[in-house]
């Protein structure tokens, strides 16, 4: 019998579903949901508190107020279940049906649904091909619309004002029909013949040529097709029946004092019902048209307000002038249903408290206050107490726990043994913000946290709080232990380096004992082993810093597992021996025989993890921490004012600087330098002085001179506390010490400009009032910045997570050969990121050949490059590797494990089911708070330093050129190509330096030459842009007429004459169409042809160019024909930090972006139009020219007759990512975005693996634009999901049909999130109304593929351990296309049978 009850219960709720579909509800469906019509606006009788009949809370419609009890009290209790009381009409059942039973209101006149009217683009407008204004005028009864033109001159859908309507009535009588209001719109929608309309539209799309028209038509066509395919009828966008929300979801609560607290929805419903009833009455009375019309308009407005208040006109406000919260407001925004209740829920079995440090804990433990544990583990304690027979009932057990008897504590200790708890610190910016620990019961009320996990939580002990959560089920405990335990999260998922490295005190302690001191007690002693050292230390026979010799036995293991043992005598100190004692076997002694700075310790831990694995590393990290804390305490390091040693040279330096400044002031006074130059020079002087003082100060702090054993002076590392803290990396930096003991330096004004008088004193000397005041700007700005930064960074993370949330590893290998070409990142003379770091943990896409022997395969395709492989690549001198990447992965939904490569947090190939999208988003978003918010103004030193005019080699090696076209000249090679690079390779052929070569640079070395460090290999003039002759001969001027197209100028100093071209606006009208040109002729006076082409050598000179030649002069190859002065380019602000990252991921078009060549070919200039230059590119083999208009003020880098490659820069500026994708393809785009994002993070010293950024880029490239339809079902110009297009192409290939043509689109992360296939995911992100409207109209189905959708519907997510569950369900679904679930009839039959048998 009990089972049957459960069966009945479960029949009501559908739990097994595979998709969710959203569509328009037809009136009949709304009526079928409803349990009765709400006819009265009354809610509750204020005296009896009982709901009014037929009102908004009517018990007959919505169900009883008390469980199993009708309203009048005739039927009570369970035995009358299901009876309908004949007196009050209430069904006897559970009161919770008031949460699920709906009612309805029959509207006296149809009403348009505001979402489909006002949510842009207006769906009703698109369907009827009318503008929103026109439809609104019809709906709100301002004009008539013709619904049936009959045999008249009027057209269907034409608007008529009152006068026009009466005129038409007089003219045509009853021939035509025109109406107003929603009825008219409904009728027009009803009469649409979708099939016919679609046919007409498709023909129009084919025939149209204008782009705007095509856009409009395809929008309409798409909507029509959506209606046709989804089974929605257009007239359902106009409501005739309004559903009423169940009353318990819009409660009315009596407060004391006879007042009621009510949900706003009740007010809105009351309005609708009042107006509806009034309208019914007016219609019954057949009131005058104008009154009825007004009432209908008011009804329309009240329904609008109920659905989405404030969307049209002024929002309806309540008694307190606050707009009422409508149905739409309930679901959107941070406080709406999606984000407040579905994506984030509060959790049971949790608590929070302040955290304090727990230096005695092991890495996997946390201290949990007994009081908290008792509360959190209550059910487990009750069960144990009952099981032991200590309590007879749960109630008794509860009493015992409240009394806190001794047995309870014993049982608590048993219960929590090996039961992990999860600790979380808000804000949880990455997955390491929640980790599992085994609780250790402690007295007190604060949670104890292990110091080494603070970095992962970003926690400190200045009052931070943390939350504790208890995993209840066995599975949850298992996952917490296997996946979330702090000992399993040693590496950071962002970059694969240890995140549990020691910091602060621990670093200081370890650094202190690893230092050595001259002439310390026991110097020069020799010890047999480290144990002997320890004894000597204990007996105070030797100082911890003494330089001694010790016999060391080490066992070294390498990455491949080979073990090597050796014993030797090492020069070391007792302190380092102490450290060596806790180092696990397998690591070499040289790793600890050095000053243990933070970097060295981190490296030690990393090596330990890679060679010895997790367990050893955890034990070692704990030991390091205990040792570090102990030794830091014993060292007695502290800070005193005396430690801030001010260098003696400071005051002389400041005097010298002031002298220089005085000189510049005098020059300014006598007019030799401009105001701007003076300012820049002064700022430069002070910046330089500051650096010099800082240098002197650090030198002063770094070393101290002491007497050695022989009584001579010897330098040793200083034991100054402040210096030690900074040097070890424990706390502080050179910049901070500079402010304490050097000079504070230059300060900025609130607007960001630098104040030219610096603060010359430091904190030890103290600041005077003016200096203090100047300092306050920066301090305030810093605080305001931090607050803004946190919000911005959080929003960026949210957008990233949203765009990448459905990206999960779902295949082992997709089998593609595509990939990205990885090269070392070289900027100027420095290798910023060597190849080994870039390819570590990636899979090789194609065989890598050995550079020393081209036939030998060095690494086979499909190899996962680990540390061993990477080292081999480096020794072979491999310079570039094609590796698999998430961007080029061919998996349809998700990515494959091979393209992703190594799971950074685990160090092996990524598992299937790993949510790599979310990990990528967190890795990029989490350091967001460390980025700066400001945009850098270029000023002072920066703007002048940028005028580089030569290349000086740093290290030396072999010269290589890249894309360099050059001609031979007497001074050397002259570069005549745009994007040339000069690289220097080392003896293994690996590039170590790389420099840009501008057009016109003179290079003094050849390809393959050996150069040495410090050699200058190229020079150029940074202030002019030359035009270089590529042939030799005689010069002939064309169209150069004095005063018309050119002016002669003579330089007073040198006496040389230059010819200056006049720009077209400065010429007299005679010269408007003339084009100054220099041709090169041979000795016979014939034009010379350019090498390798059939084009004559002629150089057109733009306005402003200066030419120093005379007509008829001889020129040689590589000579300068003319120079174009570069106006110092407008100083652009460099956007840095967080805003830059956001711009890149949002794929925003930069202002004044660089102009790229759209085709490969030859450049010429066509006819100029007003203010614009016409650039023409003629491809070599075809004659379809490409033309583009470019504003005159843009400086062009190309000359007439020059060849450009597709995608080459024609005019400088910031690059536009959309152009890169269109002209150079995905891999070039990926390289650009990855490098730009990395540059921002690198400046802040944040390491993020490239693959995270690539993962996000993959999601930004999800959409394609259809260029040609082929025989597919797409529409020309529509944006479709890339995976869908590939599926369609597979289908068409199989059927041997014409394939569609498409081009990849780059969408910004916000756009991409909203354009996802899943409407649940998009609606819970932003613009909920728009997303839901669109989804409903198109009858969208959500396949519940991503993580977000599954969280919203309350399922396990299809990632991690939930992935298996989803795969299993998918398999079952495929099997179970067979028998159906039992119908209601079968259930009833079974029920009656069971009842009859139990009745016997």
UniProtKB/Swiss-Prot annotation:
<dbReference type="GO" id="GO:0000287">
    <property type="term" value="F:magnesium ion binding"/>
</dbReference>
<dbReference type="InterPro" id="IPR007083">
    <property type="entry name" value="RNA_pol_Rpb1_4"/>
</dbReference>
<dbReference type="InterPro" id="IPR012754">
    <property type="entry name" value="DNA-dir_RpoC_beta_prime_bact"/>
</dbReference>
<feature type="binding site">
    <location>
        <position position="460"/>
    </location>
    <ligand>
        <name>Mg(2+)</name>
    </ligand>
</feature>
<keyword id="KW-0804">Transcription</keyword>
<keyword id="KW-0548">Nucleotidyltransferase</keyword>
<dbReference type="Pfam" id="PF05000">
    <property type="entry name" value="RNA_pol_Rpb1_4"/>
</dbReference>
<comment type="subunit">
    <text>The RNAP catalytic core consists of 2 alpha, 1 beta, 1 beta' and 1 omega subunit. When a sigma factor is associated with the core the holoenzyme is formed, which can initiate transcription.</text>
</comment>
<dbReference type="Pfam" id="PF04998">
    <property type="entry name" value="RNA_pol_Rpb1_5"/>
</dbReference>
<dbReference type="InterPro" id="IPR042102">
    <property type="entry name" value="RNA_pol_Rpb1_3_sf"/>
</dbReference>
<dbReference type="Pfam" id="PF04983">
    <property type="entry name" value="RNA_pol_Rpb1_3"/>
</dbReference>
<dbReference type="GO" id="GO:0003677">
    <property type="term" value="F:DNA binding"/>
</dbReference>
<dbReference type="Pfam" id="PF04997">
    <property type="entry name" value="RNA_pol_Rpb1_1"/>
</dbReference>
<comment type="function">
    <text>DNA-dependent RNA polymerase catalyzes the transcription of DNA into RNA using the four ribonucleoside triphosphates as substrates.</text>
</comment>
<dbReference type="InterPro" id="IPR006592">
    <property type="entry name" value="RNA_pol_N"/>
</dbReference>
<dbReference type="InterPro" id="IPR044893">
    <property type="entry name" value="RNA_pol_Rpb1_clamp_domain"/>
</dbReference>
<dbReference type="Pfam" id="PF00623">
    <property type="entry name" value="RNA_pol_Rpb1_2"/>
</dbReference>
<keyword id="KW-0479">Metal-binding</keyword>
<feature type="binding site">
    <location>
        <position position="72"/>
    </location>
    <ligand>
        <name>Zn(2+) 1</name>
    </ligand>
</feature>
<feature type="binding site">
    <location>
        <position position="464"/>
    </location>
    <ligand>
        <name>Mg(2+)</name>
    </ligand>
</feature>
<dbReference type="InterPro" id="IPR007066">
    <property type="entry name" value="RNA_pol_Rpb1_3"/>
</dbReference>
<dbReference type="InterPro" id="IPR007081">
    <property type="entry name" value="RNA_pol_Rpb1_5"/>
</dbReference>
<comment type="similarity">
    <text>Belongs to the RNA polymerase beta' chain family.</text>
</comment>
<dbReference type="GO" id="GO:0000428">
    <property type="term" value="C:DNA-directed RNA polymerase complex"/>
</dbReference>
<keyword id="KW-0808">Transferase</keyword>
<dbReference type="InterPro" id="IPR038120">
    <property type="entry name" value="Rpb1_funnel_sf"/>
</dbReference>
<feature type="binding site">
    <location>
        <position position="88"/>
    </location>
    <ligand>
        <name>Zn(2+) 1</name>
    </ligand>
</feature>
<dbReference type="InterPro" id="IPR000722">
    <property type="entry name" value="RNA_pol_asu"/>
</dbReference>
<feature type="binding site">
    <location>
        <position position="462"/>
    </location>
    <ligand>
        <name>Mg(2+)</name>
    </ligand>
</feature>
<dbReference type="InterPro" id="IPR007080">
    <property type="entry name" value="RNA_pol_Rpb1_1"/>
</dbReference>
<keyword id="KW-0240">DNA-directed RNA polymerase</keyword>
<feature type="binding site">
    <location>
        <position position="899"/>
    </location>
    <ligand>
        <name>Zn(2+) 2</name>
    </ligand>
</feature>
<feature type="binding site">
    <location>
        <position position="889"/>
    </location>
    <ligand>
        <name>Zn(2+) 2</name>
    </ligand>
</feature>
<feature type="binding site">
    <location>
        <position position="70"/>
    </location>
    <ligand>
        <name>Zn(2+) 1</name>
    </ligand>
</feature>
<feature type="binding site">
    <location>
        <position position="85"/>
    </location>
    <ligand>
        <name>Zn(2+) 1</name>
    </ligand>
</feature>
<dbReference type="GO" id="GO:0006351">
    <property type="term" value="P:DNA-templated transcription"/>
</dbReference>
<protein>
    <recommendedName>
        <fullName>DNA-directed RNA polymerase subunit beta'</fullName>
        <ecNumber>2.7.7.6</ecNumber>
    </recommendedName>
</protein>
<feature type="binding site">
    <location>
        <position position="814"/>
    </location>
    <ligand>
        <name>Zn(2+) 2</name>
    </ligand>
</feature>
<dbReference type="GO" id="GO:0003899">
    <property type="term" value="F:DNA-directed RNA polymerase activity"/>
</dbReference>
<keyword id="KW-0460">Magnesium</keyword>
<dbReference type="GO" id="GO:0008270">
    <property type="term" value="F:zinc ion binding"/>
</dbReference>
<keyword id="KW-0862">Zinc</keyword>
């Amino acid at each position: 019998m009990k089972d049957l009850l459960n069966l009945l219960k479960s029949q009501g709720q559908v739990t097994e579903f595979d998709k969710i579909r959203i569509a328009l509800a037809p009136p009949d469906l709304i009526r079928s949901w409803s349990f009765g019509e709400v006819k009265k606006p009354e809610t509750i009788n204020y005296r009896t508190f009982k709901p009014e009949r037929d009102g908004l809370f009517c018990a007959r419609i919505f169900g009883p107020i008390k469980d199993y009890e009708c309203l009048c009290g005739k039927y009570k209790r369970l035995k009358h279940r299901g009876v309908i009381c004949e007196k009050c009409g209430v069904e006897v059942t559970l009161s919770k049906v008031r949460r699920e039973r709906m009612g309805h209101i029959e509207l006296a006149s149809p009403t348009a649904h505001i979402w489909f009217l006002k949510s842009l683009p207006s769906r009703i407008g698109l369907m009827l091909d009318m503008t929103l204004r026109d439809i609104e005028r019809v709906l709100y009864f301002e004009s008539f619309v013709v619904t049936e033109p009959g045999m008249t001159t009027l057209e269907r859908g034409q608007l008529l004002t009152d006068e026009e309507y009466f005129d038409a009535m007089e003219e045509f009588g009853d021939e035509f029909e025109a109406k107003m209001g929603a009825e008219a719109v409904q009728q027009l929608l009803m009469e649409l013949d979708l099939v016919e309309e679609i046919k007409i539209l498709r023909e129009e799309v084919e025939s149209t040529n204008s782009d705007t028209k095509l856009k409009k038509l395809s929008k309409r066509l798409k909507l029509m097709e959506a209606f046709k395919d989804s089974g929605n009828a257009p007239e359902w966008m106009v409501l005739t029946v309004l559903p009423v929300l169940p009353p318990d979801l819009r409660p009315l609560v009596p407060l004391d004092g006879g007042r009621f607290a009510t949900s706003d929805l009740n007010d809105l419903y009351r309005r609708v019902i009042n107006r509806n009833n009034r309208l019914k009455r007016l219609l019954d009375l057949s009131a005058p048209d104008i009154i009825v019309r007004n009432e209908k308009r008011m009804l329309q407005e009240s329904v609008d307000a109920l659905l989405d208040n404030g969307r049209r006109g002024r929002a309806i406000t309540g008694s307190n002038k606050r707009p009422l919260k409508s149905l739409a407001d309930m679901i959107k925004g941070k406080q709406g249903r999606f984000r407040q209740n579905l994506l984030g829920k509060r959790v049971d079995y949790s608590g929070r408290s302040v955290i304090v440090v727990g230096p005695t804990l092991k890495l996997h433990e946390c201290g949990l206050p007994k009081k908290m544990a008792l509360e959190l583990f209550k059910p487990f304690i009750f069960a144990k107490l009952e099981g032991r027979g200590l309590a007879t009932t749960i109630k008794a057990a509860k009493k015992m726990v409240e009394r806190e008897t001794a047995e309870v504590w014993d049982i608590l200790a048993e219960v929590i043994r090996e039961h992990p708890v999860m600790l979380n610190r808000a804000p949880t910016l990455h997955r390491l913000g929640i980790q599992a620990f085994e609780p250790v019961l402690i007295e007190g009320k604060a949670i104890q946290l292990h110091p080494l996990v603070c970095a992962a939580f970003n926690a400190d002990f200045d009052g931070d709080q943390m939350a504790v959560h208890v995993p209840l089920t066995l599975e949850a405990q298992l996952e917490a232990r296997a996946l979330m335990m702090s000992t399993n999260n040693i590496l950071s998922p962002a970059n694969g380096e240890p995140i549990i490295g020691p910091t602060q005190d621990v670093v200081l302690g370890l650094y202190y004992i690893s230092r050595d001191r001259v002439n310390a007690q026991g110097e020069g002693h020799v010890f047999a082993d480290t144990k002997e050292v320890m004894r000597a230390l204990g007996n105070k026979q030797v100082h911890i810093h003494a330089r001694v010799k010790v016999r060391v036995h080490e066992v070294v293991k390498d990455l491949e597992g080979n073990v090597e043992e050796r014993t030797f005598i090492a020069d070391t100190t007792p302190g380092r021996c102490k450290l060596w004692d806790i180092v696990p076997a397998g690591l070499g002694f040289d790793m600890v025989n050095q000053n243990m700075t933070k970097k060295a310790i981190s490296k030690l831990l990393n090596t330990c993890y890679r060679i010895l694995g997790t367990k050893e590393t955890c034990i070692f990290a704990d030991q390091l921490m205990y040792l570090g804390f102990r030794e830091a305490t014993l060292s007695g390091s502290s800070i005193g004012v005396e430690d801030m040693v001010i260098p003696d040279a400071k005051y002389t330096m400041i005097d010298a600087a002031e002298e220089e400044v005085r000189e510049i002031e005098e020059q300014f006074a006598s007019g030799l330098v401009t105001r701007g130059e003076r300012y820049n020079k002064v700022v430069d002087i002070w910046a330089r002085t500051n650096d010099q003082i800082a240098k002197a100060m650090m030198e002063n702090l770094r070393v101290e001179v002491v007497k050695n054993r022989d009584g001579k002076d010897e330098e040793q590392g200083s034991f100054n506390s402040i210096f030690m803290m900074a040097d070890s990396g424990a706390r502080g930096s050179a910049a901070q010490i500079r402010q304490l003991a050097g000079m504070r330096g230059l300060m900025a004004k609130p607007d960001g400009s630098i104040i030219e008088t610096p603060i010359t004193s430091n904190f030890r000397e103290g600041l005077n009032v003016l200096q203090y005041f100047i300092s306050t700007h920066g301090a305030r700005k810093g605080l305001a910045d931090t607050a803004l930064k946190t919000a911005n960074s959080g929003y960026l993370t949210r957008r990233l997570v949203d765009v990448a949330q459905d990206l999960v590893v779902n295949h082992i290998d997709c089998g593609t050969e595509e990939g990205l070409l990885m090269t070392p990142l070289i900027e100027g003379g420095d290798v910023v990121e060597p190849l080994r770091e870039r390819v570590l943990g990636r899979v090789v896409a194609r065989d890598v050949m050995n550079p020393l022997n081209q036939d030998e395969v060095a690494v086979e395709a499909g190899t996962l490059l680990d540390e061993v492989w990477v080292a081999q690549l480096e020794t072979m001198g491999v310079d570039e590797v094609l590796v698999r990447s998430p961007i080029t992965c061919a998996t349809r939904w998700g990515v494959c494990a091979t393209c992703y490569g190594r799971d950074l947090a685990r160090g092996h190939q990524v598992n299937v089911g790993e949510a790599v999208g979310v990990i990528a988003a967190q890795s990029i978003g989490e350091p967001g708070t460390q980025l700066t918010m400001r945009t850098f103004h270029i000023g002072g030193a920066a703007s002048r330093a940028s005028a580089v005019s030569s290349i000086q080699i740093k290290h030396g090696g072999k010269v290589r050129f890249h894309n360099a076209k050059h001609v031979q000249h007497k001074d050397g090679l002259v570069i005549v190509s745009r994007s040339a690079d000069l690289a220097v390779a080392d003896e293994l052929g690996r590039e170590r330096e790389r420099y840009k070569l501008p057009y016109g640079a003179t290079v003094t070395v050849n390809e393959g030459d050996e150069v040495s460090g410090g050699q200058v290999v190229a020079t150029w003039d940074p202030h002019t842009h030359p035009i270089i002759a590529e042939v030799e001969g005689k010069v002939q001027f064309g169209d150069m007429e004095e005063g018309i197209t050119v002016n002669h100028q003579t330089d007073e100093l040198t006496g040389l004459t230059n010819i200056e071209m006049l720009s077209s606006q400065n010429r007299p009208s005679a010269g408007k169409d003339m084009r100054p040109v220099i041709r090169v002729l041979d000795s016979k006076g014939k034009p010379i042809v350019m090498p390798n082409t059939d084009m004559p050598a002629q150089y057109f000179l733009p306005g402003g160019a200066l030419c120093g030649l005379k007509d008829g002069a001889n020129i040689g190859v590589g000579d300068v024909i003319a120079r174009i002065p570069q106006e110092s380019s407008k100083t652009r602000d460099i956007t840095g930090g967080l805003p830059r990252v956001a711009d890149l991921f949002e794929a925003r078009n930069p202002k004044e972006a660089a102009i790229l060549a759209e085709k490969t070919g030859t450049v010429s200039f066509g006819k100029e139009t007003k203010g614009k230059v016409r650039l023409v590119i003629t491809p070599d083999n075809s004659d379809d020219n490409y033309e583009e208009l470019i504003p005159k003020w843009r400086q062009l880098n190309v000359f007439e007759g020059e060849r450009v490659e597709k995608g080459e820069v024609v005019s400088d500026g910031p690059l536009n990512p959309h152009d890169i994708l269109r002209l150079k393809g995905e891999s070039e785009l990926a390289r650009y975005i990855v490098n730009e994002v990395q540059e921002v993070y690198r400046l802040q010293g944040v390491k993020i693996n490239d693959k995270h950024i690539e993962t996000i880029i993959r999601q930004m490239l999800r959409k394609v634009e259809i260029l040609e339809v082929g025989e597919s079902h797409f529409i020309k110009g529509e944006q479709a999901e890339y995976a869908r297009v590939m599926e369609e192409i597979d289908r068409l290939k199989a059927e041997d049909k014409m394939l569609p043509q498409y081009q990849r689109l780059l969408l910004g992360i916000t756009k991409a999130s909203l354009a996802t296939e899943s409407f649940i995911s998009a609606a819970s992100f932003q613009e909920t109304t728009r997303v839901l409207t669109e989804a409903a109209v198109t009858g969208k189905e959500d396949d519940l593929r991503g993580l977000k959708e599954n969280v919203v519907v309350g399922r396990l997510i299809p990632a991690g351990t939930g992935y298996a569950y989803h795969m299993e369900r998918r398999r079952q679904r495929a099997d179970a296309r067979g028998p159906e679930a039992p119908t209601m009839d079968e259930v009833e039959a079974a029920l009656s049978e069971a009842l009859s048998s139990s009745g016997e």
